[in-house]
Amino acid sequence: MIVMVHVACSENMKKYFENIVDEVKKIYRIAEECRKKGFDPTDEVEIPLAADMADRVEGLVGPKGVAERIRELVKELGKEPAALEIAKEIVEGKFGNFDKEKKAEQAVRTALAVLTEGIVAAPLEGIADVKIKKNPDGTEYLAIYYAGPIRSAGGTAQALSVLVGDFVRKAMGLDRYKPTEDEIERYVEEVELYQSEVGSFQYNPTADEIRTAIRNIPIEITGEATDDVEVSGHRDLPRVETNQLRGGALLVLVEGVLLKAPKILRHVDKLGIEGWDWLKDLMSKKEEKEEEKDEKVDDEEIDEEEEEISGYWRDVKIEANKKFISEVIAGRPVFAHPSKVGGFRLRYGRSRNTGFATQGFHPALMYLVDEFMAVGTQLKTERPGKATCVVPVDSIEPPIVKLKNGDVIRVDTIEKAMDVRNRVEEILFLGDVLVNYGDFLENNHPLLPSCWCEEWYEKILIANNIEYDKDFIKNPKPEEAVKFALETKTPLHPRFTYHWHDVSKEDIILLRNWLLKGKEDSLEGKKVWIVDLEIEEDKKAKRILELIGCCHLVRNKKVIIEEYYPLLYSLGFDVENKKDLVENIEKILESAKNSMHLINLLAPFEVRRNTYVYVGARMGRPEKAAPRKMKPPVNGLFPIGNAGGQVRLINKAVEENNTDDVDVSYTRCPNCGKISLYRVCPFCGTKVELDNFGRIKAPLKDYWYAALKRLGINKPGDVKCIKGMTSKQKIVEPLEKAILRAINEVYVFKDGTTRFDCTDVPVTHFKPNEINVTVEKLRELGYDKDIYGNELVDGEQVVELKPQDVIIPESCAEYFVKVANFIDDLLEKFYKVERFYNVKKKEDLIGHLVIGMAPHTSAGMVGRIIGYTKANVGYAHPYFHAAKRRNCDGDEDSFFLLLDAFLNFSKKFLPDKRGGQMDAPLVLTTILDPKEVDGEVHNMDTMWSYPLEFYEKTLEMPSPKEVKEFMETVEDRLGKPEQYEGIGYTHETSRIDLGPKVCAYKTLGSMLEKTTSQLSVAKKIRATDERDVAEKVIQSHFIPDLIGNLRAFSRQAVRCKCGAKYRRIPLKGKCPKCGSNLILTVSKGAVEKYMDVAEKMAEEYNVNDYIKQRLKIIKEGINSIFENEKSRQVKLSDFFKIG
């Protein structure tokens, strides 16, 4: 059944894979036995098992027998050359002789499947057709018809599919595509129309770039219509079958060929393909334009005037990237404006729950921002990528806040955050964001200067052979930090290195003069520095103290500073000897180039710059953990038409003796003469063939009672079914399955499976206590040692996660208990075999197998449940997420039980429309090979600490590739046993599920509540401008919604309670079918729902006049439609002014 593919791994890991494969075989055999009984659309399990990429490609697109050859070619040549070679061999007829067009189509699909690891649906759904067409001169050329789902392949694979097309064209001896001027201009028009009417591309090409590309690409990039928008200029062209937008073709042209031009050129050079040199000219023209625009290096620029200042002190100007904040959604807060002081401090490193696009934040902050950040919440970020997922890391710098009584404190624990959250006046610093080197490498974003942190400090001490205490690095005392710096001549400890760079030189002198008026005293047995807070000048100085992030208390108009030792020494005052170390402050001030230079002239030791880069972020999607339901939710894929009413209840239809016409495959049983919708007659048990297809009266009553009789059930309660099948053959699912799902309170998806969706979060190491599993159970599952090689005996030991093990949300575990009970009922009552799961509580699920799957793919990945978490996320190894072709930037995927998929999935249920085969397990991977997963994970770093060279090099803002020589990533481990084990991380976290579990966005009710809370958060964050937030919410969310709803109201369809829908109101004003009154599909409330909120927001935050005027115009438009002025009788004299 399964060929065990050799992967480089240890004996322990090999045993783990073998156990998974054995369990898959066992479950497969159970499903095979059940399917042979004939109650399902086919007698076989419809999910082929694949041990590797080659198997997946053959299972997904074929041709038969290609897997072995793919393995040989990939081993010999590598993935990309192998894809081209396999395409050539298909064209040559080595895998079957069929007509020319079919060969070309098979070659392109198979090559694209190899390029996308046989995971995504693009080779099946993204290529609608491949044709051989004629040029005006009579020569033949190749045309690839792309469809919308080609998006799932990603830009690089889209571009390479065009390269494959060219390769196939040459192999078949075809000429190149010769476009007419009208066809060229049609592409220009379509790109512009798509951007104005449908959506934006990742790249915005010029008209000349499009013209150059179309003239030079050797095949025709065309496609089927994907949008209802029609071109107005270049219509009815002989070789273009539609006047509508060809979205798939445009994606391939813009986000494939033009955006990924550098990658195409690399492959062209590597593979020796001719005819693509025009891309070099296109790129050089683009580079020239960029040089003309500005002399900046990408977004980053070093201020040349400051070059003369020593590297650690200089000001580095990094241009803010404002793209992430171009639109703000109502109710979802902005946490920091682009690069604004007080935002997230960039810190390099990886915790056991970060990496692969997920970033770490201090859990205390999550409570301080009113729980709008929870575990798994998506953030749209300024850099290095476009988005990330929030996870807690409590070993990084916490937020610093100012309380309403004037105190400034570091909120370094969740308990402290909960205590002060209602007393916070201002969040001065949001704390660190932990970003791993791999994310910069993946996004090819220049490395930005590292913050001054404990890891860098420790590396300096090690490099200089200076002895130190580990506790001193983590938690130094103020006096100890000063003494250590003076004695060892090293920079001051990061803990007491304040944000001097965020205030001016004059501010520093003002602060110094004020502090020196104070005195040393004791408070509650501790030495403190006390300064008066009386006059306006004192208040200005206190504000500077706040801005540099120095903690202090305010009592009786006095400022009390506990960590005064490093503060005063940094300002040139010897606390120990009560002596001012500065003789001529005016001269020093004059000679200082900037604030950091001034501090270093004042202090008796080196003071490093605390922060070079502040990162902006806003909330994206909230985290998700919920059962997958169709709209509306149904229990089974059994069609009942409109017989069950709006709620689609078959039991109600049976009770009321209702029926309706449905399109189905059926036959008349030769034995009992009754109509059978199944391959086994439900009334007499005779095996039949469904040889008829058409519209019949649904025999609901007969089927209902036959199903109840077979299951031995009297009254199952409400059972929700579908109105009609969307599949091609309209083969129905047995009604018994719907009844059993309803009894167990579970729902069905379009393909017959029962799924649970949750946000993807990576984890490489865990503690047994975090995932609610006993040490004994973990030892049974093969976890017997911790990361230090010690025997696993305690729930707090850190253990490395195996690549196919998953930790599901608690709510998922509870749902899967119901699903397992449904499967067992199905086995026992429907298939008449033994129960399998025998699950009573969620702990019983541990050790069972699931399938993990992403919506844009057609290949599932086998996983094993090893625990559950209270967080609303699905934890899995980064490899597991990558095997689904996902990263972890806030996306969600689904889990479903393996036996559920084997028993209930059928291709016969899949919708007969473009994209219908996406999100369906058309093939299943049993063994995870890191070489065959999404390449993004290969950039994730695997080190236990970053070297000193890395931190030093970041100051030069190099390309991440320039430091690769002293960094280790997953790529360096591929093909070795270490690819699975011994992966390191740099920062610890107490628990992977610290912080709020549910984002406030989901708990708040009305939009008014959400926007009020959103702006309340903005008000208290120093790095956020609440007026700008209000303006952006109104402009990018409310105004487009109001206009769109107004337009929708004027174009709306109407419906009737009988289920009929009409594009326009019928002339008689009532439903022609039943005579009932018609109902609007867009109500007045839907049109004006945001109007009041927008007006209140505009008034309260005094947004600009332009926005206020736009709102006024929209309101007038709404009133003109919905005004209902009572008519009144008027006399002629009313129109005259009577004196």
UniProtKB/Swiss-Prot annotation:
Keywords: DNA replication, DNA-binding, DNA-directed DNA polymerase, Exonuclease, Hydrolase, Multifunctional enzyme, Nuclease, Nucleotidyltransferase, Transferase. Its EC number is 2.7.7.7, 3.1.11.1. It catalyses: DNA(n) + a 2'-deoxyribonucleoside 5'-triphosphate = DNA(n+1) + diphosphate; Exonucleolytic cleavage in the 3'- to 5'-direction to yield nucleoside 5'-phosphates. GO terms for biological process: DNA catabolic process; DNA-templated DNA replication. The keyword Transmembrane does not apply. Heterodimer of a large subunit and a small subunit. Possesses two activities: a DNA synthesis (polymerase) and an exonucleolytic activity that degrades single-stranded DNA in the 3'- to 5'-direction. Has a template-primer preference which is characteristic of a replicative DNA polymerase. This is DNA polymerase II large subunit. It comes from Methanocaldococcus jannaschii (strain ATCC 43067 / DSM 2661 / JAL-1 / JCM 10045 / NBRC 100440).
